[in-house]
Amino acid sequence: MEYVSGGELFDYIVKNGKLQEHEARRFFQQIISGVDYCHRHMIVHRDLKPENLLLDHNMHVKIADFGLSNMMLDGEFLRTSCGSPNYAAPEVISGKLYAGPEVDIWSCGVILYALLCGTLPFDDEHVPTLFRKIKTGIFPIPEYLNKQVVNLVCQMLQVDPLKRANIEEIKKHEWFQVDLPSYLFPSNIEQDSNVIDTYAVQEVCDKFGVKDTEVHNALLSEDPHDQLAIAYHLIIDNQRFADEAAKAEINNFFVAGSPPPKL
């Protein structure tokens, strides 16, 4: 288990209050990167909130507490009402069916608001009143927020899940794109499905105590829920993230070390 020394994002917000826009954006970009990673691997968190977002010694966000998470299956919907009330989507507190990603998007919208404002968009000590506020989707918008980020928050806090922004729309939003580190969303490089990474296969074998032929068979089966295949693709993705991060650090090093321009 990884030790994360920076504490909860919640405590950071309590200590610092509303964050500067550039800092809020940096945290939010990392959160969306992590949520996107979960969704691409068919996992919906369902309890995203600052208390479940941890900070490491470099102030990088780590998503934690997957106790209420669930696997997404094609054509199937979820109904369980779970998560923290202040961050729960309208369809969740109403007991309606939901696919999964859209409820995480709502929670991320609440988190973004909290980062920028130091308060919650929907809050009340009386839970029924809180639920009524959430279902209306009406929340105060401070005058100091710029129009771009207000537009993004409003897209994420749409009561109708069909009108709510999805991950791809968030990633393409002009506010989100500012100073976006390339390693958070590595470019999708199409790989030859016939080429199998032997290092990743060996790592799966070591972790699960299986033979390489079993991993090969799992990959050939193309079963999206096979644990060996999932582990293999997670290893490949992690390596891709690490490679992109290393490139970014090297680029930053050369930029920082460049001589100043002549005046």
Per-region residue spans from a language model:
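C-terminal regulatory tails of eukaryotic serine/threonine kinases
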Residues: 162, 168-259
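A short, hydrophobic secondary-structure junction motif
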Residues: 111, 259-260
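Eukaryotic serine/threonine protein kinase catalytic domain
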Residues: 1-180
